[in-house]
């Protein structure tokens, strides 16, 4: 465990600005959740200040309990807000967003893991805000291929699914129901269903991973056709979560970025404060996505 104080390079700016305030007000108005707040993302100030947000659907309680995550774990008992897809679409339109990320808690209590709710949300956003590019960050749906197909058929521009860590650390870091190989299969199946959909994954560093395992993870992701990759520093959100083993220096993130780019990823974001939806709508990604929509 790292006993050193948090270095300057992982200290984020406090959220400020009129766009941030307006977005926070809209979230309350529509009774919506953002992963920006629920997961204590360090970039909430930067992203909300620029009018970008990641919406978290299907409630605030996750049926899993990954040891890195700050989202509440509990029993949603099959409950879903049927108006949520329309609420998110209205919020996206009201904010004038051009790029939206939709993620969720895990919902193992639902027959389809919430795949149909994902699809309804994507369709609602497309209907009300047709010019918006849509990225989804999906759970593994228990490995259900039919559920993955449901999301793919709703035609998001990007489908992300996070490995989170290297294979040797997966049992320590993720919920026991998650699997490194199953997550790779999720990403592979998306590509098999529709090669036009960009796929994306993310890793946290600083949990005690070995360099050779990180590089092997890059190769595993490319082997299943993953297009985009993000790498960021794990930051302990609370005392009940895993401790930080190491604060990775910025130059090490640069090294990993170069290594990933050499393997053929179309886009790599690598840095201490990078998260899976970090600057997801930035110009480079937007240019790549729009021609296929």
Model-based region annotation:
Residues 1-54, 58, 70, 86-93, ...:
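Auxiliary Fe-S-binding modules of radical SAM enzymes
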Residues 73-100:
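Conserved alpha-helical substructure of the radical SAM core
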Residues 75, 101-111, 141-144, 157-180, ...:
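Conserved radical SAM core fold
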Residues 58-65:
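Short pre-active-site segment immediately N-terminal to redox-active cysteine/selenocysteine motifs
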């Amino acid at each position: 465990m790292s006993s050193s104080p948090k270095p300057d390079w992982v200290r984020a700016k406090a959220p400020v600005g009129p766009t941030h305030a307006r977005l926070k007000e809209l979230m309350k108005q529509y009774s919506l959740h953002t992963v920006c707040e629920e997961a204590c993302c360090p970039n909430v100030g930067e992203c909300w200040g620029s009018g970008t947000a990641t919406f978290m659907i299907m409630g605030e309680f996750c049926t899993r309990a990954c040891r890195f995550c700050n989202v509440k774990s509990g029993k949603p008992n099959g409950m879903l807000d049927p108006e949520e897809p329309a609420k998110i679409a209205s919020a996206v339109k009201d904010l004038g967003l051009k790029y939206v990320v939709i993620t969720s808690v895990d919902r193992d209590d639902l027959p389809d893991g919430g795949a149909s709710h994902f699809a309804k949300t994507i369709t609602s956003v497309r209907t009300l805000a047709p010019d918006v590019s849509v990225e989804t960050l999906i759970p593994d749906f228990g490995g259900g291929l039919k559920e993955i197909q449901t999301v793919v058929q709703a035609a998001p521009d990007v489908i992300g699914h996070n490995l989170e860590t290297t294979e040797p650390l997966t049992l320590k870091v993720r919920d026991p129901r998650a699997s490194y190989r199953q997550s790779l299969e999720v990403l592979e199946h998306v590509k098999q269903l529709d090669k036009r959909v960009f796929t994306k994954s993310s890793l946290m560093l600083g949990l005690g991973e070995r360099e050779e395992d990180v590089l092997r993870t890059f190769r595993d992701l490319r082997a299943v056709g993953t297009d985009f990759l993000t790498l960021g520093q794990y930051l302990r959100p609370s005392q009940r979560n895993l401790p930080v083993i190491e604060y990775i220096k910025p130059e090490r993130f640069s090294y990993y970025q170069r290594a990933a780019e050499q393997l053929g990823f179309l886009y790599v974001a690598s840095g201490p404060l990078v998260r899976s939806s970090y600057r997801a709508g930035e110009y480079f990604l937007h240019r790549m996505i729009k021609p296929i929509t």
